[in-house]
């Protein structure tokens, strides 16, 4: 009986297997080969292997792949490294080990000299972070299968697709145009980004293999793109950020209604190369009106003199300045609700001045006569917002307590009995008004019970203590209710703080309004003082350099290429037997920065005492009188003296008598 067709089919790799293989291989063979950024991994729990070292991996690829073009020996040497060896030996079956070696070879062969493309990066989609991209190294013809740009395809279920989308790892998902099934492709082909007018397309070579074929001619330095799907970036790709949509100002690049689109191009920013000199005062005035996105500054000057001293001086001056209005010092409710950002800085608390005996006595008498309240004296003006508590001096508090004990009645019955009904009504009205206008500071600064108990017993004996009545008097009851309400409000606030905060998770963050070219020459990437936008002297691309005290001559892509192949980008190998260009394999012997003259020219500085170039010297010689070097001048003088006995002025030379023969 003939075997069934399903039995002859090879078992496909699962999503977990392909993700594990691809993560460690991109980490070892891309990130650790002079790559200036990192490739996004498929698993959030992946951590780079400690056994993968950049010098070791780069040396193997340069010796075995770039120079010898031997993939078998490169594969064997790579599997002897600590990181890859540990992962390879951890695989259980021979089938898994064979699949891992095949996937390893897909990444190794991209470093062959005949590979027409290379892995680069772009910040078009997120501005602040770089993602992998594919750039052509030579011209590619139409309908040409792009060599070594291949991968493996894995069909995923809807549940797996939802899990990948929730983790924001759906950057390699494609939808088949025939079967309409969703699949995830891994390998070097996953570095190709999406474009609505792509210059290449994905093709299936086997039941799991894919390759990329050019649909139109591709020039050197152009990004190789494919089409992911019609509705991959929302409905009708309404959130697409590709180059075609940027040029046509559509989808995510579409400007808002009522706004004029501003094309932030590189040519526009560099067209204003020459301008008249202006004073620094004019620059400071007109600097606020300049938009960084319209006229970007490649090397902004950020002063490093913003020290702690200036900040502290500004804070102390703002605190101590007495000329500020009272309304400007009032804090809003939002400011009071949130804690300060710098809790280490303590606010300076003022001390209440010591009130004299006569003034305190007068204020206490008036307060006791008008209101009849026992609680406290209102001695400070009313303020709308609470201020920090101020601790009074002990002497002042004792004096106030003495005066209160002498003048203010203790028993509410005695006060009620001694007063007439008119006085009672006036006391009630004045008490209510005083309670309404009482500030929080006055309530908080009540004398403590310990201070009252510490008074001499002789003074305490003079006061007759009367037990409180069963029915409380109106002013006392009003004050107690007011305090209880405040305490209840504080208790409610404390309870509210203890409640857990509810966080509403958003599936997608709010879309940011993008403008064409906002990812180039943008100040968002210049987060440090010595960061600058630099233009590569080889490929004319712009890149951000950190610690740009000395300007680099090449971009990270050109530097990586020269370190691996020993030639200037995009050359990878000798053109023929007559090619005499030197191949420098030790990248440490190459000076990667600009010379002093070019450095001054880039920074728009004058070259004081700088040596002129050969072309400038040749032009000066042709325009002016002939110049001679030291050796040339000596030779010229010697020849003239030998030919004639005249001086340069025309007079005859006199020979010294010591040199004459006797």
From Swiss-Prot:
Gene Ontology molecular function: histone H4K20 trimethyltransferase activity
InterPro entries (alphabetical): Hist-Lys_N-MTase_N (IPR041938), Set9_fungi (IPR025783), SET_dom (IPR001214), SET_dom_sf (IPR046341), Suv4-20/Set9 (IPR039977)
Comp. bias (Basic residues): 647-656
Pfam families the UniProt entry points to: SET
Compositional bias of kind Polar residues: 304-326, 355-379, 398-437
UniProt EC number: 2.1.1.372
Main subcellular localisation: nucleus
Role: Histone methyltransferase that trimethylates 'Lys-20' of histone H4 to form H4K20me3.
Similarity comment: Belongs to the class V-like SAM-binding methyltransferase superfamily. Histone-lysine methyltransferase family. Suvar4-20 subfamily.
Protein name as catalogued: Histone-lysine N-methyltransferase SET9
Originating organism: Gibberella zeae (strain ATCC MYA-4620 / CBS 123657 / FGSC 9075 / NRRL 31084 / PH-1) (Wheat head blight fungus)
């Amino acid at each position: 009986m003939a075997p069934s067709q399903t039995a002859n089919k090879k078992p496909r790799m699962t999503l977990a297997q392909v993700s594990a293989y691809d993560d460690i291989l991109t980490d070892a063979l891309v990130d650790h080969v002079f790559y200036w950024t990192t490739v996004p991994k498929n698993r959030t729990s992946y951590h780079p292997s400690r056994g993968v070292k950049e010098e070791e991996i780069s040396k193997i690829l340069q010796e075995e792949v770039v120079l010898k073009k031997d993939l078998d020996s490169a594969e064997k040497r790579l599997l002897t490294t600590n990181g890859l060896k540990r992962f390879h030996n951890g695989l259980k079956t021979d089938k898994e080990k064979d699949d891992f070696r095949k996937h390893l070879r897909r990444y190794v062969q991209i470093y062959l000299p005949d590979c027409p493309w290379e892995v680069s990066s772009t910040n078009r989609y997120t501005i602040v972070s770089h993602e992998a991209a594919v750039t052509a190294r030579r011209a590619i013809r139409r309908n040409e299968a792009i060599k070594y740009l291949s991968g493996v395809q894995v069909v995923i279920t809807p549940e797996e697709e939802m899990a990948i989308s929730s983790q924001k790892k759906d950057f390699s998902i494609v939808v088949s145009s025939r079967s309409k099934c969703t699949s995830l492709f891994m390998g070097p082909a996953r570095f190709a980004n999406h474009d609505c007018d792509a210059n290449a397309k994905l093709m299936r070579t086997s039941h799991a293999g894919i390759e990329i074929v050019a649909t139109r001619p591709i020039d050197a330095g152009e990004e190789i793109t494919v089409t992911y799907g019609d509705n991959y970036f929302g409905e009708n790709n309404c959130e697409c950020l590709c180059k075609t949509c940027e040029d046509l100002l559509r989808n995510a690049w579409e400007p808002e209604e009522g706004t004029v689109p501003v094309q932030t191009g590189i040519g526009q920013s560099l067209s204003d190369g020459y301008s008249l000199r202006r004073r620094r005062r004019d620059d400071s005035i007109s600097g606020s009106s300049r938009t960084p996105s319209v006229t970007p500054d490649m090397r902004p000057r950020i002063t490093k003199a913003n020290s702690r001293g200036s900040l502290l001086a500004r804070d102390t001056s703002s605190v101590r300045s007495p000329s500020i209005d009272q309304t400007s010092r009032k804090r809003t409710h939002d400011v009071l609700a949130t804690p300060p950002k710098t809790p280490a800085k303590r606010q300076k608390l003022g001390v209440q001045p010591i009130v004299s005996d006569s003034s305190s006595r007068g204020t206490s008498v008036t307060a006791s006569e008008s209101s009849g309240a026992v609680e406290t004296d209102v001695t400070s003006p009313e303020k709308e917002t609470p201020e920090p508590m101020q601790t009074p001096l002990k002497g002042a508090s004792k004096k106030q307590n003495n005066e209160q004990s002498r003048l203010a009645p203790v028993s509410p019955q005695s006060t009620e009995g001694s007063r007439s009904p008119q006085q009672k009504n006036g006391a009630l009205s004045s008490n209510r008004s005083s309670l309404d206008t009482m500030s929080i500071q006055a309530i908080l600064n009540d004398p403590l019970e310990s201070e009252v108990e510490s008074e001499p017993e002789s003074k305490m004996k003079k006061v007759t203590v009367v037990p409180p009545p069963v029915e409380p008097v109106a002013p006392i009851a009003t004050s107690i209710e007011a305090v209880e309400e405040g305490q209840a409000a504080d208790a409610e606030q404390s309870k509210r703080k203890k409640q857990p905060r509810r966080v509403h998770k958003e599936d997608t963050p709010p879309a940011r309004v993008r403008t064409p070219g906002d990812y180039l020459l943008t100040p968002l990437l210049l987060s440090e003082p010595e960061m600058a936008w630099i233009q590569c002297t080889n490929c004319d691309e712009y890149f951000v350099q950190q610690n740009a005290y000395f300007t680099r001559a090449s971009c990270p892509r050109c530097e990586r290429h020269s370190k691996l192949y020993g030639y200037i980008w995009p050359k990878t190998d000798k053109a023929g037997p007559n090619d005499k260009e030197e191949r420098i394999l030790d990248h440490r012997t190459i000076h990667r920065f600009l010379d002093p003259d070019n450095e001054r020219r880039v920074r728009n500085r004058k070259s004081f005492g700088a040596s002129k170039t050969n072309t400038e010297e040749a032009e000066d010689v042709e325009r002016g009188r002939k110049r001679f070097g030291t050796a040339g001048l000596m030779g010229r003088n010697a020849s003239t003296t030998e030919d004639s006995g005249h001086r340069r002025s025309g007079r005859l030379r006199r020979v010294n008598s010591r040199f004459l023969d006797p």
